[in-house]
Amino acid sequence: MTSSNRYTASEILTVLSARALENGQLVFAGIGIPLLAATLAQRLGRPGLTILFEGGVIGAFVEPGKLPPSTNDQRCTKRANMVLGSADVLLLLQRGYVDIGFMGGAQIDQYGNLNSSFIGDPDAPKVRLPGSGGGNDISSLTNMIVAMKHEKRRFVEQVDFITSPGYLRGQNSRTDAGLPAGGVFRVITELAVFGFDAETRRIKVLSLNPGVTAEEVQDNTGFPLTFDDGVTVTEPPTNEELETLRMLDPERLFTA
Amino acid sequence: MPSSDVQSYATLREDLAKRDRSLREKVVSLEEAAGLVRDGMQVGIGGSTMSRTPMALIWELIRQGRKQLSCSRCIVSTDGDLLFGGGVADEIVTSWFAQGILWGLSKVMRHHVEAGDKRYQEWSHLAMGMRFRAGGMGVPFLPIRSMLGSDLMPLRPEAKEFDCPFTGEKLLLVPALNPDVAIIHVQRCDAYGNAQIDGLQFMDIDLALAANSVILTTERIVSNDQIRRMPDHTKIPFMCVDAVVEVPYGAAPHECYGLYEPMMKHMEAYVAQVNADPVEGMKAYLDRFVYGPKNWTEFLSLIGMEEIVEASRQGRSMYND
């Protein structure tokens, strides 16, 4: 879907996600693109970025070419500051120590709610998906970035099932449900970068990826999109970003 | 007993008082250990995803034809496939159930859950942790601030929304989970069950304290003197433990921290086979790798020396600079 053959959809997704992370932040990363993007950010001049994994790791520096196959494998602990229990690392989210939660998504809606549990009726699902893992906890307890592939069936008006809460039904509904902290503030896809309206809490396009038109984003989205007043065009991935990324994932486990 | 039923404190104390908690030798064979798990029990499984899975014991439970178990674990991967496909478990209580992020959805889980013959009871990861922790603390529930507002909350009426008596804030009370038996794989323990876990401990300490009995499988049995030289490495104390089994490579084809990484060629072949046909593919896998071998070592030889050596090389490289 990218207009360029310099990089794959997963690669621009990872590069743009890495750009959203700042030195000094504490980032709770899921497996796949989030882990790779956070590791890329560390390698691109943000070594003070602390990565937490739900397997029970604080401050990982994953080795190039040795990406862990899950956030619960020994490779996640390489050069970490601390290893602790899974419940305890999740409690750091609840206490408020973590700046950013960073996840992938299977299905998202206009209020940033994520579904990773059921396609169809939960009592008789068409597809039983893997489930929450730490997703519900991360999205309930901290500010969150979601990185995901942009497809019409994944960007829907209302998800079949809210596994991980965004802004629920918009306005104040998240706070009213007992979730006063956090909330999704960026959604990054291979087509565009999205934010959320401060009042309605509905998703809106902030910037278009290089070579992507507004029509293209709308055509791949299952509901009418709002475009921010000053929609910008994102700078394309630099050679340094792409080369570093390919050094980290030489087998293209997560960036094929 | 349905896994959502919280046991009364009196029952918990009575059951624990009946256990022999003395410092005594508990070493048994894999076959004898599996015999301690009886049909219909709630079984807590240590480790997470592809790490420190007590695979040899799960393998032996399938061989012995155990039935109608309800199994709980923080995150489930191919162990869950085998528990469903091997006819051992009717229900799995967890936060995430697939074969691994590299392979997408588990066709085995989908086949059984979508057909309705097996149940996948989903909680958030933190909820699973606080359920085991409440069980280990001897309290009937703990409050958490996640799952609120999501569709997981109505899906799990066992969890109760609650207004905090101090602040008036909304909280979710998750019920204690006290498994009948916990099965946990560790790097080393002594004959009494003092277990030293290297690396990621996941929810194993809470699980061991919560369960009404604990079976340890261990890469090696060391002397009590050796344990006492590094007591700060002991994560599960002997009085929680009821049986100890020495099973080298007892988490294969999953990983055991510092010793071996997942045996990915075996895993990839497994996933391709069962996802191509979750019934016949699983049956063929079980026939060849579970029912076929005469013992665990023969199973390991079917995985193959080359792959085990490579997984061990990668596993030990954790300690390289």
Predicted regions and their residues:
Chain B
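Conserved alpha/beta enzyme-core scaffold
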Residues: M1-D321
